[in-house]
């Protein structure tokens, strides 16, 4: 791909968040300490490259528990599950390892608390996203899912004085702020979490895109079409007035997108491995093209592994391998 690009700017931070790293590590560690086969309900994270890499190592991905044999080991994806799924797994005698992101679990616990206190709950998010489906299952009779500020006026709740809001963790910070503002105007006594439900990684990656957007003519976001956080990065860039395109990998790049662009930005969604960044830079960078990192914040978040993995390893007398190189192997 020979193009007159003078400089490639890489957003920082980018790529795997702590929840994704943990989920991938869980699958790899389970494959090393459990008796095969190891099943994973849904995509462990929303990235085809990651899923195919783990499938090649022996993970079996299924859509529903009906595809998992009785007494087998099953891993729940990073996006979380509804209580009904957990109950079904217990009834079937499945050995469960829960890879739900701790920040998603936090939203589930908030939903449970508000429901017990008889609040109507507004969940800001996309109704068809796995994370929202799981959270909705915690209190289906009390949760109302909305995606935009224009839906606020259509909300009907039993007691406007007893209402709370929660958010999907991977939304656009700006769009969510607009929805929350609309909710507060209509329901002045609405309550919400003590801290924003939108995860640190989502906020940091969107801030990095905003910073990069002002310095480039085109921004390429590498991520899956079903990745909420990757799609939000495209929207953030476009709202900043920059041409932005979502690609699965370098093969999706169209030369006409880059016509006349001297500075091109590259970033990836929170479920996308760094190897795809390297491949994209290699394809774009001709002789003499400078590559520069643009950092807005450093990250040092790391989540502990679920207790179930330690228990399984202990039962089998197998020490858990180090996590250091697990997700880096993709």
What do these predicted regions represent?
Residues 1-268, 274-330:
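The feature marks the mature, well-folded catalytic cores of soluble enzymes
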């Amino acid at each position: 791909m020979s193009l007159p690009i003078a400089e490639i700017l890489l957003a920082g931070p980018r790529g795997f968040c702590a929840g994704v790293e943990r989920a991938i590590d869980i699958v790899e560690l389970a494959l090393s300490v459990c008796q095969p086969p190891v099943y994973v309900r849904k995509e462990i994270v929303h990235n085809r490259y990651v899923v195919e890499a783990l499938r090649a190592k022996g993970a079996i991905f299924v859509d529903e528990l009906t595809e998992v044999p009785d007494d087998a080991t099953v891993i729940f994806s990073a996006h979380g599950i509804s209580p009904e799924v957990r109950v079904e797994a217990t009834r079937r005698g499945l050995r469960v390892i829960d890879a739900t992101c701790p920040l998603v679990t936090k939203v589930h616990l908030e939903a449970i608390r508000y429901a017990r206190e008889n609040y109507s709950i507004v969940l800001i998010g996309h109704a068809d996203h796995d994370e929202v489906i799981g959270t909705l299952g915690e209190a289906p009779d009390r949760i109302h899912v909305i995606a935009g500020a224009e839906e606020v006026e259509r909300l009907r709740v039993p007691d406007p004085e007893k209402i709370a809001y929660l958010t999907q963790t991977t939304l656009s910070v700006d769009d969510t702020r607009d929805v929350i503002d609309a909710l507060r105007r209509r329901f002045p006594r609405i309550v919400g979490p003590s801290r924003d439900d939108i995860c640190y990684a989502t906020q940091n990656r969107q801030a990095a895109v905003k910073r990069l957007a002002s310095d480039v003519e085109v921004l390429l976001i590498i991520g899956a079409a079903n990745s909420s956080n990757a799609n939000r990065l495209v929207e953030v860039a476009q709202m900043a007035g920059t041409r932005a395109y979502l690609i699965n990998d370098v093969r999706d790049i169209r030369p006409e997108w880059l016509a006349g662009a001297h500075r091109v930005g590259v970033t990836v969604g929170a479920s996308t491995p760094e190897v795809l960044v390297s491949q994209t830079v290699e394809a774009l960078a001709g002789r003499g093209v400078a590559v520069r990192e643009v950092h807005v914040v450093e990250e040092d978040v790391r989540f502990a592994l679920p207790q179930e993995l330690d228990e399984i390893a202990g039962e089998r007398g197998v020490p858990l391998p180090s996590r250091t190189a697990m997700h880096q192997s993709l």
